[in-house]
Amino acid sequence: ISMLQHDFSFDSAGSYTVRFAIEMLMVYFLEENFDPKYLAMVAKIQSDEYYINMMIAWYFATALAKQWDSTLQYLTEERLPLWVHNKTIQKAIESYRITQEQKEMLRRLRRK
């Protein structure tokens, strides 16, 4: 939680620390403690590491289920790297927490 109160830098943190921080945001800050700035924090993370990118996609897929309106703009505005964008859509479509109508919309947002 202290990372949210201080100038935590994802850039200087190790892979495990980054993944752990994203998971904490996903678990504790997508419902009653939600703030759209957390979406922006995660979207700014740039990495070539598979597990970091998978964690980012998992975070955004979960965010779609819990904060649809705030999260959808990251896909419609193409604010995520291509791989993360498409993996987010894949994971969200696999979720039981997303409606069929939402899944159809997400399918149309896939990028090539």
Regions found by a protein language model. Give the residues of each.
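Alpha-helical scaffold domains
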Residues: 1-112
